[in-house]
Amino acid sequence: MEKEKGEEKMNDSRKITVIGLGYVGLPLAIHFAERGYNVVGLDKDKRKIERIEKGDSYIPDVSSNVLKDLVQNKQLVVYTPHTGIEEFQNSEYVIVTVPTPINKQKEPDLSALIAASHYIKQNLQAGQTFIFESSTYPGTLEEVIIPIIAQSGKEVGKDYYIGYSPERIDPANQQYTVQTIPKVISGQTERCKQQVQKLYSTIFDTVVPVSSPKVAEMCKLFENIQRLVNISLVNELNILCEKLGIDFREALEAAATKPFGFTPYWPGPGIGGHCIPVDPLYFQWKARQLGQSSQLIEVAHMINEKMPQQIVTQVKELSAPPGTVFLIGIAYKKDVNDLRESPALPIIELLVNEGYKVQYHDPYISSAKIGDKIYDSIPLKKKTLEKADCILIVTDHSNIDWNICKGMKHVIDTRGVLKKVSA
């Protein structure tokens, strides 16, 4: 059988480069390093590079002790893109996990993905395999990424290989880990897909090949579109049931006893994080390019956007400005230090605009810039809560003793956590 171009070029099949060392990239880099791969991490944020080199993790799911050991043993080395070119060129596999947010117009911001593609174009070596994991709309790999890399003069499927495998990670989830979550993979050609599978089958328990990158890209969006629609539904029903004098959580718990045909979703202050509020808007943007739109996504997004104002309205019903509102938890979900798209951000800005004084406690976020002001987390003490005019539970962190809220007046529990506190 004739070897394809580049097969003899690569000489270090155990070297992996991960571009982007955030909530997806760093745990993935650690996972590879722990399984014997020599891992190179690239990130333009010099502060991240410095912290990794010191063995100081900035992600709760990554142990500083583990990180320090891997760095000291040279199983994980980190650079900025500029200083890590040689290491990049000596890697057989390159995995891209850069952020794909939305801009102020609620449209896809592919700037980091495009920058990574240009970096690959400029430094590509024959025989390398590139795997993109960043969440994006269907067609991005074929219509945006590959045309940029093609400017190198190299041919996909012959000179280099490329595929898409949507990131699947649930921060703070101890049940489903990087290794155990099934991994969907795809390739631009059959050989590309084989290259992706060759690597990922060594570190993931289950690999799920699909027919094309577009299918894999859509898979990721569909997962989060489903969650947006269902969580927005229960948030709306929760509001309506309150006006009807019905305990919606009790009704939901009762409905959840049905062993078939029902999946429970739980209401809250609004959907946060980088994925669920963002990915559906990527799909909507792509649909609009074709003159189409999803009405269901549109309505679900609108409901989610209105949730912070709904919470502030509840606060105003209990306490008038210029009272003090004390937020417990500001991260977008429990047990993480991630503020991205957290409903706490617009809630705090709305409260300040109404004239309230705002304080917060979050065991994972010591300080946060919200609007034009920097807030510092205040220790959670009974005296502090007693002085507040309203207590607003936004994030139900596991390491908070919720008994401290018992007996307090004017508590808004957006997570239903106090129902679980023993009497």
From Swiss-Prot:
InterPro entries in UniProt: 6-PGluconate_DH-like_C_sf, NAD(P)-bd_dom_sf, UDP-Glc/GDP-Man, UDP-Glc/GDP-Man_DH_C, UDP-Glc/GDP-Man_DH_C_sf, UDP-Glc/GDP-Man_DH_dimer, UDP-Glc/GDP-Man_DH_N, UDP_ManNAc/GlcNAc_DH
Pfam families recorded: UDPG_MGDP_dh, UDPG_MGDP_dh_C, UDPG_MGDP_dh_N
A GO BP entry: polysaccharide biosynthetic process
Active-site positions on this chain: C275
Catalytic reactions of this protein: UDP-N-acetyl-alpha-D-glucosamine + 2 NAD(+) + H2O = UDP-2-acetamido-2-deoxy-alpha-D-glucuronate + 2 NADH + 3 H(+)
Assigned EC number: 1.1.1.136
Keyword set, alphabetical order: Carbohydrate metabolism, NAD, Oxidoreductase
Coiled-coil boundaries: none
SUPFAM superfamilies linked to this entry: 6-phosphogluconate dehydrogenase C-terminal domain-like, NAD(P)-binding Rossmann-fold domains, UDP-glucose/GDP-mannose dehydrogenase C-terminal domain
Residue sites binding NAD(+) per the record: V24, D43, K48, T100, S135, R340
GO molecular function: NAD binding; oxidoreductase activity, acting on the CH-CH group of donors, NAD or NADP as acceptor; UDP-glucose 6-dehydrogenase activity
Its biological purpose: Dehydrogenase involved in the biosynthesis of the nucleotide-sugar UDP-N-acetylxylosamine (UDP-XylNAc). Catalyzes the conversion of UDP-N-acetylglucosamine (UDP-GlcNAc) to UDP-N-acetylglucosaminuronic acid (UDP-GlcNAcA). Cannot use UDP-glucose, UDP-galactose and UDP-N-acetylgalactosamine as substrates.
Family: Belongs to the UDP-glucose/GDP-mannose dehydrogenase family.
Identification of the protein by name: UDP-N-acetyl-D-glucosamine 6-dehydrogenase
Organism: Bacillus cytotoxicus (strain DSM 22905 / CIP 110041 / 391-98 / NVH 391-98)
Classification lineage: Bacteria, Bacillati, Bacillota, Bacilli, Bacillales
Gene symbol of the encoding locus: UGlcNAcDH
